[in-house]
A protein has these predicted regions:
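A short, Lys/Arg-enriched amphipathic alpha-helix followed by its capping loop at the start of a domain
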Residues: 32, 36, 116-125
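Short glycine/proline-enriched coil/turn segments at helix->beta-strand junctions
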Residues: 82, 123-125, 201, 215-216
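Short, compositionally biased strand/turn segments
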Residues: 19, 125-126
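Asp-based, Mg2+/Mn2+-dependent phosphohydrolase catalytic module
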Residues: 1-7, 17, 91, 114, ...
């Protein structure tokens, strides 16, 4: 008898990937500030600027609307311009923030994502999402047809906490109605998998993205690999 009844997936680098390679710096950003220009900056200064601009999202992940996301990411870009000494304007910041929210072409489904979810759904599994993300994700979930297969969603911007905070996993478990040992969580980040494991959820690491630190958890290279891995839990 299969002990697994529910599979939770992260979104970023698990089912979705950013076309530019960065979730917050999309193609339009690199049209304004080419990669060659960014690469010529002192990388310590650049990283400090990026981290400083992003810090408010870590300190307060709660968000209520796409409009709030646009406003907050406008401030993100303005801070980044200032800290990195980039010649960006307020108008640039607004355009980048609006593009982040409204342009569906800033991210793609990772190959085999949709087919894997369909196979799991047809196999009787409950499917959930546990993701650190922002309100713009709703229109992408629909555009990529993930909502045809996903039963439940746990988003950081709704709860006001980020993984590895255990409240993210508690919320997902409560929505699922299943015991932790009946669930798998697929994510790229070890710290998130450790948190899930501490709750009794089976962790599986996806290493689709280059440079991911790996550990001792079961691993998959792409979403469809979960189908074979599930046989180990039967």
């Amino acid at each position: 008898m299969n002990q697994i009844k529910c599979i939770f997936f992260d979104l970023g680098w698990t089912l979705l990937e950013p076309c530019s390679g960065d979730w917050n710096l999309n193609q339009k950003f690199y049209e304004l500030f080419p990669r060659e220009k960014i690469s010529r900056l002192d990388q310590n200064v650049w990283q400090h600027a990026y981290n400083t601009a992003y810090l408010p999202f870590i300190e307060n992940p709660k968000m209520t609307s796409e409009q709030e996301q646009i406003e907050r990411f406008t401030r993100f870009y303005l801070t980044l311009f200032d800290q990195a000494k980039l010649e960006g304007t307020f108008q640039h910041a607004v355009k980048l923030a609006v593009d982040m929210v409204e342009n569906l072409a800033t991210m793609n489904l990772i190959p085999s994502s949709l087919e894997t979810l369909k196979t799991l759904k047809d196999g009787g599994y409950r499917i959930g999402i546990i993701s650190d993300t922002w309100p713009f994700i709703e229109r992408r979930i629909h555009a990529f047809k993930l909502d045809e297969y996903v039963d439940q969603y746990t988003y950081s911007y709704e709860l006001g906490v980020l993984k590895p905070d255990v409240h993210m996993f508690q919320n997902a478990l409560e929505k699922s109605g299943f015991k932790p040992e009946e669930c798998i969580f697929v994510d790229a980040q070890l710290r998130n998998l450790k948190a899930a494991e501490s709750m009794g959820i089976h962790p599986v690491q996806i290493v689709y993205h280059e440079g991911v630190e790996t550990g001792d958890y079961p691993t998959i290279q792409k979403p469809s690999d979960i189908l074979n891995l599930l046989k180990q839990y039967q």
